[in-house]
Every structure is written in C-alpha cells, then in structure tokens.
C-alpha cells in the first residue's frame, strides 16, 4: 500500500465507516442473546450436569466400590473409600466429588460397570462457599433419589447409542 492510499484511508476514516455499516446491518435483525434466567434454551439429551449416585429398585446402593471412576478421573475430583461387608461384597463408606475440580468429561459415568454414578441434566446449582460444591455420598444419593425417573428416562433414550 502506498503512502497516498494509506493517507486517504485514514483521512476519510474508511475503516470506521465499514465498522458502522456492519453494525447498522445487524441493528434491526433478530437478536441472538438469550436472557437466561427468564428464557431457557433447549438442553441436549447428552448434556452432562450435576452428578448423582443411583440405587437399585430394592433401595440398595448400586456402587460396588470398584474405584474405576476414581482411577479414570483426569481432574482427580473423585475420592472413594470402601469396606468389605460380611457377605464379602464391597460397598463405599465415602464417595466424594469436588465439583470445583470436576471438568464434567463423563469418564466416570462411562467407566462405571453398574451405572451407579451418572451426570444428570441439572445445570442450575450453586454454592455460596467453596465447600458447598464438595458433594458427599449422602448428597449424591439424595440427588439420585430425587431425579431417578429423569435419570432412568435419559438412560433409556441414550441406550441405542451406547
């Protein structure tokens, strides 16, 4: 670009006019912004949200303390402690997920052989303190008990793709 061309581009503010033209073109078109708390966008059936621990129909926890989810977690967000019961089966005494570390990759859900740990469709949860996002076994079971019908329906809908 020669010095004369550069002078006329900057003197007549052609870049500014191009930017204003672009802005003017989109001023009267449909807006892309969603006002989130009032308006909701559709959620994908494979959305990975809040974690939950599931139970069998008889009320027993599904988790067999194999610790595969703990081993596969790339963020090291899962902590499991277990003990052996009288009938030589293992069950968890501690199952904690630190949601401040979790990257919601879904590896824990994929690795679980008994579909105990699942990621629900829940995306609206919060904590006022950092410790509020540290979910214990009882909290995860409560989430699973509360949303079991939704979790079962999502699992059934996703079954052909697994």
From Swiss-Prot:
Function noted in UniProt: NDH-1 shuttles electrons from NADH, via FMN and iron-sulfur (Fe-S) centers, to quinones in the respiratory chain. The immediate electron acceptor for the enzyme in this species is believed to be ubiquinone. Couples the redox reaction to proton translocation (for every two electrons transferred, four hydrogen ions are translocated across the cytoplasmic membrane), and thus conserves the redox energy in a proton gradient.
Chain ranges of the 4Fe-4S ferredoxin-type domain: 54-83, 93-122
Domain of life: Bacteria
The species this protein was found in: Burkholderia cenocepacia (strain ATCC BAA-245 / DSM 16553 / LMG 16656 / NCTC 13227 / J2315 / CF5610)
GO molecular function: 4 iron, 4 sulfur cluster binding; iron ion binding; NADH:ubiquinone reductase (non-electrogenic) activity; quinone binding
UniProt keywords, alphabetically: 4Fe-4S, Cell inner membrane, Cell membrane, Iron, Iron-sulfur, Membrane, Metal-binding, NAD, Quinone, Repeat, Translocase, Ubiquinone
Major place of residence: membrane
InterPro entries: 4Fe4S_Fe-S-bd (IPR017896), 4Fe4S_Fe_S_CS (IPR017900), NADH_quinone_OxRdtase_chainI (IPR010226)
Topology term for the membrane: Peripheral membrane protein
Compartments, as annotated in UniProt: Cell inner membrane
Entries under HAMAP family matching the protein: NDH1_NuoI
Name this polypeptide is given: NADH-quinone oxidoreductase subunit I
Gene Ontology cellular-component terms listed: plasma membrane
Record's subunit section: NDH-1 is composed of 14 different subunits. Subunits NuoA, H, J, K, L, M, N constitute the membrane sector of the complex.
EC numbers, comma separated: 7.1.1.-
Disulfide bonding pattern of the chain: none
Catalytic reaction(s) noted: a quinone + NADH + 5 H(+)(in) = a quinol + NAD(+) + 4 H(+)(out)
Pfam families: Fer4_7
Positions with a binding annotation for [4Fe-4S] cluster 1: 63, 66, 69, 112
Matching Gene3D superfamilies: 3.30.70.3270
Cofactor note: Binds 2 [4Fe-4S] clusters per subunit.
Binding positions for [4Fe-4S] cluster 2 per the UniProt entry: 73, 102, 105, 108
Cofactor(s) of this protein: [4Fe-4S] cluster
GO biological process: one example: aerobic respiration
Family assignment from sequence similarity: Belongs to the complex I 23 kDa subunit family.
């Amino acid at each position: 670009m020669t010095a004369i061309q550069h002078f006329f581009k900057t003197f007549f503010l052609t870049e500014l006019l191009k930017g204003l033209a672009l802005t003017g073109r989109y001023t009267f078109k449909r807006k892309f912004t969603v006002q989130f708390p009032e308006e909701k966008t559709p959620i994908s059936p494979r959305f990975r949200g809040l974690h939950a621990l599931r139970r069998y129909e008889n009320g027993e926890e599904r988790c067999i303390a194999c610790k595969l989810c703990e081993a596969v977690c790339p963020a090291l967000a899962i902590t499991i402690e277990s003990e052996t019961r009288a009938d030589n089966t293992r069950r968890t005494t501690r199952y904690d997920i630190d949601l401040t570390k979790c990257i919601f990759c879904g590896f824990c859900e994929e690795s679980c052989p008994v579909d105990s740990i699942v990621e629900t469709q829940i995306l609206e949860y919060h904590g006022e303190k950092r410790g509020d996002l540290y979910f214990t076994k009882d909290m995860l079971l409560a989430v699973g008990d509360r949303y079991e019908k939704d979790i079962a329906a999502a699992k059934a809908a996703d079954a052909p793709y697994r």
